[in-house]
Amino acid sequence: MKLFPIFSDIKGRCVLVVGGGAVATRKAQALLEAGAAVSVGAPTLTPELARLAQGQTITHLQGEFDADWLKDAWLIIAATDDRTVNTRVYEAACARRQFCNVVDDPALSSFQVPSIVDRSPLIVAISSSGLAPVLARRLRERLESLFDHSLGALAELAARYRPAIRAARADLKERRRFYDWLLDGPVAAALRRAQPQQAQEALDEALARPALSQDGRVVLVGAGPGDPGLLTLKGLRALNEADVILHDRLVSAEVLALARRDAERITVGKRLGENHNATQARIHELMVEHARAGRRVVRLKGGDAFIFGRGGEELEHLRAHGVDYEVVPGITAALACAAYAGIPLTHRDYAQSVHLVTAHCRADEEALDWDGLARGQQTLAFYMGVGQLDILSARLVAHGRPGSTPFALIENGSRPSQRVVMGRLSQLAERAREQAVASPALLIVGEVAALADRLAWFGKP
């Protein structure tokens, strides 16, 4: 271990920053956040530092570096763009046995400032010992995405309740189990939703019970259309915490690869020709079964669970069986596929509204308002329509939509294998057969579909 990691309490202590530029400004602001009494030594200051000095938030030591500036300093940071000045600062600090950091110069530093992930009071520090600061910064960025911003509030709540938890759970093993529940259960979930009152109530109720509930919970997560980069941060965190993942067949392997490695993965997607109601009933059973076994369950759906994903039915089943749940929205296929094809769903010249339509209904196609769908100045996005293209185009034309209306069929939208087949509405079924378009594919009908010709950026239309 090249460096010894240490966290320092600098509240009220004098910290000297030598330099008045942008880097010095960032360092001074970070030190102020930690409660330090900051002095900045420099001939001139950035507007932000000048404002802080004018408001007496910092002390400005004006002029060229003077070793006398160090006499009251507890820590020193040299942040000038002149290595000669930085060397003088470092040597003066060493002569007085004071810790000094020269920004981006490990050879002239007796301590280094790490990259941090701040979820105060929880702080994670990352250091490459000054050898690879870009790598440390990249790791910090990844950790930022994994650590929910509610962790600080959770740590503060746990600290506030520590005496009560110790009193209610005298046995060490029971206390550890309680803390595991606190970190993984409804208290943490409420804080993630920015509901501190509900979190406190859940904690009070748990402390009043002689034993913890063994029930788990279900998180309904929208995985997006395929590109793993479109998974939300909340969705990623849920996958990293899951014990069991019940996923549809359309969820990409790349998204599943982001999940916790030891999580049990169960494919529950429906196949063409299956009894979908029976399959859905089995999904309901699995969610309840695993949650009641105390497991954290992620129900992972392609796109967004509430856009033609039967997410509402699944929540109704969970509510009826008393299972706790949470919903993490996803990017639905219409939004993502259109964007990846270069198609703006609305455009002031062509479309003032968007209709999301499923071509796979409980009843037949007569359930749709074809007169309304055939009107102009709107965009239609049809889900699950590959097997209904003849009917869709014929109905739209019969109800007044011109056969010359542009369409775009987007197959495997947002994935490396994405294809976009374009044409006129009267040619829809024929073009799809010629190009052997297969599911999953999204159909967009409207003047905006033609824009893919000149706005495409991901692959080629």
Curated annotation (Swiss-Prot):
S-adenosyl-L-methionine binds at residues 225, 302-304, 307, 332-333, 384, 413. The modification Phosphoserine is found at residue 128. SUPFAM superfamilies: NAD(P)-binding Rossmann-fold domains, Siroheme synthase middle domains-like, Tetrapyrrole methylase. InterPro entries: 4pyrrol_Mease, 4pyrrol_Methylase_sf, 4pyrrole_Mease_sub1, 4pyrrole_Mease_sub2, CobA/CysG_C, NAD(P)-bd_dom_sf, Siro_Cobalamin_biosynth, Sirohaem_synt_dimer_dom_sf. The active site is at residues 248, 270. Pfam families: CysG_dimeriser, NAD_binding_7, Sirohm_synth_M, TP_methylase. GO terms for biological process: cobalamin biosynthetic process; methylation; siroheme biosynthetic process. It catalyses: uroporphyrinogen III + 2 S-adenosyl-L-methionine = precorrin-2 + 2 S-adenosyl-L-homocysteine + H(+); precorrin-2 + NAD(+) = sirohydrochlorin + NADH + 2 H(+); siroheme + 2 H(+) = sirohydrochlorin + Fe(2+). Pathway: Cofactor biosynthesis; adenosylcobalamin biosynthesis; precorrin-2 from uroporphyrinogen III: step 1/1; Cofactor biosynthesis; adenosylcobalamin biosynthesis; sirohydrochlorin from precorrin-2: step 1/1; Porphyrin-containing compound metabolism; siroheme biosynthesis; precorrin-2 from uroporphyrinogen III: step 1/1; Porphyrin-containing compound metabolism; siroheme biosynthesis; siroheme from sirohydrochlorin: step 1/1. Residues 216-461 are annotated as: Uroporphyrinogen-III C-methyltransferase. Keywords: Cobalamin biosynthesis, Lyase, Methyltransferase, Multifunctional enzyme, NAD, Oxidoreductase, Phosphoprotein, Porphyrin biosynthesis, S-adenosyl-L-methionine, Transferase. One of its GO terms (molecular function) is precorrin-2 dehydrogenase activity. Residues 1-203 are annotated as: Precorrin-2 dehydrogenase /sirohydrochlorin ferrochelatase. Then it catalyzes the NAD-dependent ring dehydrogenation of precorrin-2 to yield sirohydrochlorin. Finally, it catalyzes the ferrochelation of sirohydrochlorin to yield siroheme. This is Siroheme synthase. It comes from Bordetella avium (strain 197N).
